[in-house]
């Protein structure tokens, strides 16, 4: 009998969202969004679930529902930086697996969270694990808001990009620049899923790593790890996860799912 990989789930949550203010505290069926996310992390089997925020109201909401919460600085440029502060404060062992569960994804699949943690444990040469799924629609391949990842033979990330990678010269070149005429990909193209598992030793070193030119160009923070020589293992799933909440329309859609009688 195999035992699940032990891991810690950290949920970075900040109130200062420009498109949806006070997002972590938005009501979903009588509970704040951040609590719904924490419940998913607990269902995934995390040994410890921590809500990390710079807002006392978010910490209070988590604690009121029985979850641990830790106050972090307000000036973090990314969720990874917030995780790094938490990892340093708790002094976890180097090989501790820490999963960053986004605070605006109350519908995230607990199985995916658990599987990404296990995927990192199964790849000792990697500092990070994440996930991706196949893209079947040409429009997604050419959409810069859809982040693509190119993989090596061991499904370790070679590069993440908003551009269409890999570029199929024979399939795409005859139609360029008419994106609407592009055929569906006849080879594997993968969309990155923004769920990460980290080794604690990497999180402690992350704040000291200089930003990478490719990170700044693409506006993708995972490129900093690749730039500095770290390896990222990628778990391939068959389908896309439920979308997170970024806008009032997203919130209304998810709130409807938490109404009594909804399925």
Swiss-Prot record:
HAMAP family: KdsB. This is 3-deoxy-manno-octulosonate cytidylyltransferase. It catalyses: 3-deoxy-alpha-D-manno-oct-2-ulosonate + CTP = CMP-3-deoxy-beta-D-manno-octulosonate + diphosphate. It comes from Burkholderia cenocepacia (strain ATCC BAA-245 / DSM 16553 / LMG 16656 / NCTC 13227 / J2315 / CF5610). GO terms for biological process: CMP-keto-3-deoxy-D-manno-octulosonic acid biosynthetic process; lipopolysaccharide biosynthetic process. Pathway: Nucleotide-sugar biosynthesis; CMP-3-deoxy-D-manno-octulosonate biosynthesis; CMP-3-deoxy-D-manno-octulosonate from 3-deoxy-D-manno-octulosonate and CTP: step 1/1; Bacterial outer membrane biogenesis; lipopolysaccharide biosynthesis. GO terms for cellular component: cytosol. SUPFAM superfamilies: Nucleotide-diphospho-sugar transferases (SSF53448). It comes from the Bacteria. It is found in: Cytoplasm. The gene is kdsB. InterPro entries: Cytidylyl_trans, KdsB, Nucleotide-diphossugar_trans. Its EC number is 2.7.7.38. It holds the Pfam family CTP_transf_3. Belongs to the KdsB family. Activates KDO (a required 8-carbon sugar) for incorporation into bacterial lipopolysaccharide in Gram-negative bacteria. GO terms for molecular function: 3-deoxy-manno-octulosonate cytidylyltransferase activity. Keywords: Cytoplasm, Lipopolysaccharide biosynthesis, Nucleotidyltransferase, Transferase.
